[in-house]
Amino acid sequence: MNSKQQKKYFVGIDISKDSFDATLIDEFQKKLFYQKFEMNKSGFKSFLQKLEKFDKVLLQITVESTGVYFISLYNYLLNTGFSISVINPLLVHNFHKSMSLRKTKTDKKDSFIIALFTLKNPEILSKHSKQTSTMKRLCRERDKISEEIAKVKTEIKSDLNVLFPELEKHIDPFTKSMLLFLEKHSSANSIRKLRTTQIDAIFNKTKGNKVRMKSVELKKLAKDSIGNGDKYLEKVLSSKIRRLKLYQELNKEFDLEISSFIEQNQSADFDILTSIKGIGKITAQKFLIEVDNIRNFNNHKQLTAFMGTDPSLKQSGTSIMYQGRISKRGNKYLRKTLFQMAVSCIRNDSTFNAYYHKKRDEKKKYKQAVIATGNKLLRVIYSMLTKENYYCESYR
């Protein structure tokens, strides 16, 4: 964004579900207006009328990335030509603490603090694209769908263990051809009644992922099966297979959208990040979308605090003690992603493997050692992305 010498007016917006509070200050920290507005079209128009008294070129607006509530207002202001940034609430919180202000919480003061933060910290404000926040939601939805896929696969295996227990030992039940077949004929009892030509006809309907078993072999396996035929359980299994296929289609659709977004917006960072052994496509995408722009953080400690993998502190009087636990105050999705990346890097990279075992030798528990390795990984990632360097195993 433009430097603070070029901006003369700063608006902080504190948003809730049904309303938002806005404070506008000038470059001398003088409060020019404060007002509460309804979170609807009428409220948006009233706010716009207030802002139109000031030159857009000289005005900088900032909102906190609080849940999903800010997105509609953010897009509305962006479409009307205002310069607007989205800021991590943790940065505002830390700024607030550093100002030694009273601990009473009011929305009026919150919007003023955001405006003051905007004035004092122009270099770390970022202009998000319209898609940034919604892309995070899409990425998180893909995670949920992946979890549902794993869950329904487990349920399908459980049902097959009753209806056709021998099947999984001889063939993968999750190929396209086999799923199509089992959707129609969900038990050994049902398969026994089919002719081999009927089995072949179903297998030949799909392209790729062909069943590696001849129809005559499948029929014999069904004939010798100890599985129990149950028309109600067969309907349940058929329903779960249809659900699995739907989840897989959604997952594929979301994957294409996310890959396209990364290619258009963060391809250079993606290539750098995946140069680390153990960081694959999915985790790299999740990390980059959740962080959004790693250059918004002045150092790796800010990034660690944003994730919530920094050590928690306990203060008593003038003494500050490290608790040994992580604070968990930051982005839980990033914490999960970092943990996944750390586990994979421990398995695939000698540097992180050695660091993990060093922590284990220091009597750290498994999870503690992985988190410590994750924080080391985070330091490396921060350095790589901000300096635009690819990884090598001697990287420190």
Model-derived features: positions:
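A detector of single, family-specific signature residues
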Residues: 1-396
